[in-house]
Structure formats: structure tokens, C-alpha cells
A protein has these predicted regions:
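Conserved alpha/beta-domain cores
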Residues: 2-226
Length: 227
């Protein structure tokens, strides 16, 4: 991955029509599948939100996905947020969209449709200040200490940052997240912080083939949310 990233220009804004068509067709297939699943489950249209993980994708590819109907993006690595944010923000504004926080963005239309920009990967404390001008939600907060650090930075900038508390439902050592038994208490503490908006809980299912085991992880998380 490192070698690949060293050779790809993530700030590139131009892609050919063949690649744009591939992206458009892929986005439409996923959106159609979500709509069918909503209908089958008796859910309201649009109640399931699709976040496009844009790791290793350049600005041009991401904009092609937005042109195809993506309305929420997420980056795994703070370095990629920093590399792509300026170009994405400008091109989104050209299309009447406002990306992420829009902090300090004088180009965004006053009536712009908002495209949330999430950090979905792990966040080191020394990178907090570098991503806050752009991302509006951090999905990988695994404890009070990290939340406090984010809150201090957010208050200093005069903004409010959304966070998801990551819970390690699978119990796998390779996964981050707090202990499920501590999640309610940690969430309550995070919710009290200035500059933080607790938006919910997240987990990554167990890395197994047994669907019942994977579903149990998410079912338990939902039960915790409803506590």
C-alpha cells in the first residue's frame, strides 16, 4: 500500500470517461440495491445512508462518485484528508455542494447541500488539529481521553465535531474500540464534552464466515444504543 500511495497523485482532478462510467455504474448498482433492501424491510426510502470509503481514490474519482449520487464520504487516513480536502472543497462548491465543516471556506454557496466528510480510520492525537478544518465526524473514537483531546481542539476553533464511539463487539485483539460493557458509561462522559456531538456508536463485525456471529455483534451494539 505504501509503494502504491507513493506513486499515486491523490490531488489529481481529471479522470477519463471510461473510469467515470465505471464509478457511476458502480454507485448506481449499490444505491439501487439499498433501495430494494429498504423496500423489502418496510423501511422508508432514504432511511439507509451510504458512506463511500475513499481510501486511495484521488479527487477526480471521488468527484465522479459525488456526481453519480454519493452524498457522504469517509477517509481512513488523516494524511489523505489533508491531501484531498482543498480540491474536493473547491470542486464541490462549483457544483453547489458544501463539503465537511466548510471551516474557513469562502467559496461555499450559502444554500449549498451538505456532503458530510468523515474520518473512518484510526486517529492519532497529533493529527487532530490537521483534520478538523475539514472533517465533521470522526468515527473511530474509542475512549474518553481521545474525545477530550478532540473537544479541546474543536472548542479552540469554535466548532462542534461529531463523533461515533467505537465499540469492540467482536472482542478481537486486532480491532480497536472500547469494551462493550463500558460503552454506556463512556458514551455518557463523551456526550458532556463541549465541542463534541455524540452521534452514535459503531463497530466492525467479527472477521468470520458465520453470518449469525457477525449479526450478533451488530445486534448487541443496537441493544447498547437503545439502553
Amino acid at each position: 500500500m505504501t509503494a502504491y500511495m507513493d506513486h499515486k497523485d491523490l490531488t489529481n482532478e481529471s479522470i477519463d470517461e471510461t473510469r467515470a462510467t465505471q464509478i457511476r455504474d458502480g454507485v448506481h448498482r449499490v444505491l439501487d440495491a439499498i433501495a430494494e433492501a429498504e423496500s423489502a424491510a418496510g423501511r422508508a426510502p432514504g432511511s439507509v445512508k451510504l458512506l463511500a470509503a475513499t481510501k486511495t481514490r484521488d479527487v477526480g474519482e471521488i468527484m465522479a462518485a459525488i456526481d453519480a449520487g454519493i452524498r457522504m464520504i469517509g477517509e481512513n487516513r488523516p494524511q489523505e484528508v489533508m491531501a484531498k480536502a482543498e480540491g474536493l472543497r473547491r470542486l464541490c462548491a462549483d457544483r453547489g455542494f458544501a463539503l465537511g465543516t466548510g471551516d474557513g471556506d469562502t467559496t461555499r454557496p450559502s444554500d449549498a447541500e451538505h456532503i458530510p466528510f468523515h474520518l473512518i480510520g484510526q486517529l492519532q492525537a497529533n493529527k487532530i488539529g490537521k483534520i478538523l478544518p475539514d472533517v465533521n465526524t470522526i468515527e473511530s473514537v474509542d475512549g474518553v481521553e481521545l474525545a477530550q483531546r478532540i473537544a479541546r481542539r474543536a472548542v479552540a476553533r469554535g466548532i462542534t465535531v461529531g463523533v461515533l464511539l467505537e465499540v469492540n463487539e467482536s472482542g478481537e485483539a486486532s480491532k480497536s474500540g472500547c469494551d462493550p460493557q463500558a460503552a454506556v458509561d463512556i458514551a455518557a462522559q463523551i456526550a458532556q464534552l463541549d465541542g463534541i456531538r455524540l452521534e452514535g456508536l459503531m463497530t466492525i463485525g467479527a472477521h468470520v464466515d458465520d453470518e449469525a456471529t457477525i449479526r450478533a455483534c451488530f445486534a448487541h451494539l443496537r441493544g447498547t444504543r437503545d439502553t
